[in-house]
Amino acid sequence: MKFGKSLSSQIVEMQPEWRDNFLSYKDLKKRLNLISGGAAGERASKRRRVGGATAVTVTAAAAGGMTLEQAGFVGLLDAELDKFNFFFLEKEEEYVIKQKELRERKMASAEEVMRVRKEIVDLHGEMVLLENYSALNYTGLVKILKKYDKRTGSMIRLPFVQKVLQQPFFTTDLLYKLVKECEEMLDQLMPTNEHSVASEDGKDDSEGEEKGSKPSSSSSANGGAVPGEAEDERSTDMKSTVTAALRALREIRSGSSTVSVFSLPPLHGSNGQDEPGR
């Protein structure tokens, strides 16, 4: 499956608040198609821009050796980075606060512990999705930059990707640490509830093909310890979304046998989380 279709199918699976914060891959491709390739196209583009752009914009584009269309494309890429960073940092802060709250609640009564365990499971799933968000957007940027270089004969992919590597949305060390702490909390809670959740854990082991999907089935097999059908449905949706996200990410990372400086590391093991944060 081509990346654009894979990304689109992934976005459809996400919660509404996530959907508009992924890479605008289609818009970037449309903008790229407005850029004429080669020297003749560059001359024509320069003629077009003189009448329709401000002197400041033309001067800035010319100073960078770009046509107006090229400068607009790069400007759109920079806007995408700002969008990724804002969303990623907002989510990361939300997860830090939520995890601290769950850590403080996990020593409560048996009934409350079951509720906390379910919330940890859901939080774990959302953090896995945010890791996936980071990797998908990075991959999309690399692919669209490759198309840009090929069309224009420019070589902006390497310097732009070097800038991307320093962006908050790509720096997942803290997120990786939070994911591991979630797993440790789940391990600590398991002995406390081993009698009441033994049956659901057996089900988890058989169904948990991906990390994040394993614990997410807890809400559907706890004998009513977690009230609310809406909550059960949300956990089921989360499990499905995480599983689809990891499957798409595996497909993207293993889609080419050619390894380059721009390649993401492969996913190892069945849970997709053996690699350290970037």
Curated annotation (Swiss-Prot):
UniProt keyword list: Nucleus
Nucleus listed as a keyword: yes
Subcellular location: Nucleus
Entry-linked PANTHER family: SPX DOMAIN-CONTAINING PROTEIN 2 (PTHR45978:SF5), SPX DOMAIN-CONTAINING PROTEIN 3 (PTHR45978)
Superkingdom: Eukaryota
Listed Pfam families: SPX
CDD domains assigned: SPX_AtSPX1_like (cd14481)
Record's comment describing the protein's domains: The SPX domain is sufficient for inhibition of PHR2 binding to DNA.
UniProt subunit comment: Interacts (via SPX domain) with PHR2 (via C-terminus). Interacts with RLI1 in the nucleus to prevents its positive regulation of leaf inclination during phosphate (Pi) starvation.
The species this protein was found in: Oryza sativa subsp. indica
Statement: the UniProt record of this protein carries the keyword Transmembrane: no
GO biological process assignments: cellular response to cold; cellular response to phosphate starvation; negative regulation of unidimensional cell growth; regulation of leaf development
Region ranges (Disordered): 191-242, 255-278
Listed name of the protein: SPX domain-containing protein 2
Entries under InterPro entries matching the protein: SPX_dom, SPX_prot
An example Gene Ontology CC term for this record: nucleus
Protein task: Inhibits PHR2 DNA-binding activity via a phosphate (Pi)-dependent protein interaction. Together with SPX1, plays a negative role in the regulation of leaf inclination by preventing RLI1 transcription factor activity in Pi depleted conditions.
